[in-house]
Each structure stands twice: as structure tokens, then as C-alpha cells.
From Swiss-Prot:
Lineage: Bacteria, Pseudomonadati, Pseudomonadota, Gammaproteobacteria, Enterobacterales
Protein name per UniProt: Uncharacterized protein YigF
Length: 126
């Protein structure tokens, strides 16, 4: 159920670039990256690497940006995860847990949006 994202006028060129990279080389794994992905990623310029690797809007606006992208299920989970992170951080005196959640969202938003737009997968899982 792959969507023709190249001819989709609602997507910016940046999203089309990310999507074509994922189509050609796959996703980075959580623990391990495939050799093909690693080689293609190393061949990119630093700015292109950042475009593929992290979504800065998602890092700074996390769940709000997920709602804007139509990833409302993941946005609800991120809100709940953020509340839990703030609560646990307050209990143990570590306030950086909110940044960890924001970083996780920033790194994974590109993949989640690709799955939604191209593959038609929109689940509750993070």
C-alpha cells in the first residue's frame, strides 16, 4: 500500500527527499544500522544528514507537531510519556527526562510520518 508521494503536492521537497532516502536505503534500526544505510548516510553532506536524522521542529514542539502532521495517536502517547517523565524527574531530582522524550520524538518523527504517508501505518506504538 505504498503511496505515490513524489507527485503529492501537499508534501514539501524536504519530506520527499526524506521519503526517497528511506525507500532506497531503509530505516536506521534502534540498536543496529544496516551496512547499506550506513554507507549511504556517510555519503551525504552534513546538512543532508541532519535532514534525514532529526526533525528539529518535532524536537522543539513534540506533541503539537505530531498533531499537525496527523499523527494524533502518537501525540497522545507522547503527552502521557512526557507527564510520566516530568513526574519521575521530579521524584528523583533529574529534570533532563523531558529532553530525552523530546529528543526521541525529534529523531523518530520522520520515520513515523513516512510510515503514515507512504506505508499507510498509523499505530499507537512509538
Amino acid at each position: 500500500m505504498d503511496k505515490d508521494y513524489i507527485n503529492d503536492g501537499s508534501l514539501s521537497e524536504k519530506w520527499k527527499y526524506r521519503f526517497s532516502f528511506y525507500d532506497q536505503h531503509g530505516f536506521p534500526g534502534f540498536w543496529k544500522v544496516s551496512p547499506e544505510y550506513k554507507q549511504a548516510f556517510k555519503a551525504l553532506k552534513p546538512r543532508q544528514r541532519l535532514t534525514i536524522q532529526i526533525n528539529f521542529i518535532a524536537f522543539f514542539f513534540s506533541w503539537i507537531y505530531l498533531f499537525v502532521l496527523g499523527l494524533w495517536k502518537k501525540a497522545i502517547i507522547v503527552i502521557l510519556l512526557g507527564i510520566v517523565a516530568i513526574f519521575i524527574g521530579a521524584l528523583i531530582g533529574v529534570n533532563i527526562l523531558g529532553l530525552v522524550v523530546a529528543a526521541y520524538v525529534g529523531v523518530n518523527t520522520n520515520k513515523w510520518f513516512y510510515e503514515k504517508e507512504v506505508k499507510g501505518i498509523n499505530t499507537w506504538s512509538l
